[in-house]
Design a protein with these regions (language model features):
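Conserved ABC ATPase "signature" region
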Residues: 94-109
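Q-loop/switch helix immediately C-terminal to the Walker
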Residues: 72, 78-92, 96
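Helix-to-loop junction immediately C-terminal to a conserved catalytic motif
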Residues: 49
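Walker B catalytic motif
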Residues: 113, 142-143
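Conserved ABC ATPase signature
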Residues: 113-120
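Conserved structural motif at the start of ABC-family nucleotide-binding domains
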Residues: 4, 18-21
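ABC-family nucleotide-binding domains
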Residues: 141, 148
């Protein structure tokens, strides 16, 4: 069974302690990091992914193939939606990828370049790219930012499908209804 273990994690920036003795275990399904802006949710995700080193504690995040969506979408702005997905998926781009674009409301954007998308459209495309990339675990930093209620619901459905087979670590500062049991880590 896949299991992400975080034990006594601490992270400081100078005199500022951002993560203080964080411990949890995450398995296939959704683990939600909940807390106000600036509390350390993004820092924790970056430590899990190995992008930052903790000052103390352990995490076995390097045991997994991760995909991530951070607050910056990091898309290829000169390409359209399909081009962004093909860049990640290569020959594995298929009907399922196109269906996910449709589900997330991006099926009718044609050859419009990503740089011309709204912020919400870019967010949904970044999420689609992460959901489709081969991985064991997803790190989703505020994945619903800029989404209206309808698109938020579509994104949630897609995330929950991924959580059937992957570890999903989802950060949010809002109390969002997640229609399945999930672990909540309050920071």
């Amino acid at each position: 069974m896949m299991e992400l273990r975080v034990e006594h994690l601490c992270k400081r920036y100078g005199e500022n302690t951002v993560l203080d003795d964080i411990s949890f275990t995450a398995r296939v399904g959704v683990t939600r990091l909940l807390g106000p802006s600036g509390i350390g949710k993004t820092t924790l995700l970056r430590v899990l992914l190995g992008l930052e080193t903790p000052d103390s504690g352990t995490v076995n995040g390097d045991k997994f193939r991760w995909t991530a969506v951070f607050q910056e979408n990091r898309l290829l702005e000169g390409l359209d939606a399909e081009g962004n997905l093909r860049f990640v998926l290569g020959a594995n781009y298929n009907a399922a990828a196109q269906a996910l674009l449709e589900e997330l409301g991006l099926g009718d954007v044609g050859k419009k370049r990503v740089r011309d998308y709204s912020g919400g459209m870019q967010r949904r495309l970044a999420l689609a790219r992460a959901l489709l990339a081969p991985s064991d675990a997803l790190a989703l930093d505020e994945p619903f930012t800029g989404l209206d209620a309808e698109n938020r619901e579509a994104a949630m459905r897609a995330i929950l499908r991924a959580a059937e087979t992957k570890i999903v670590i989802l950060s949010t500062h809002e109390e969002l209804p997640i229609p399945v049991p999930c672990q909540i880590i309050e920071l």
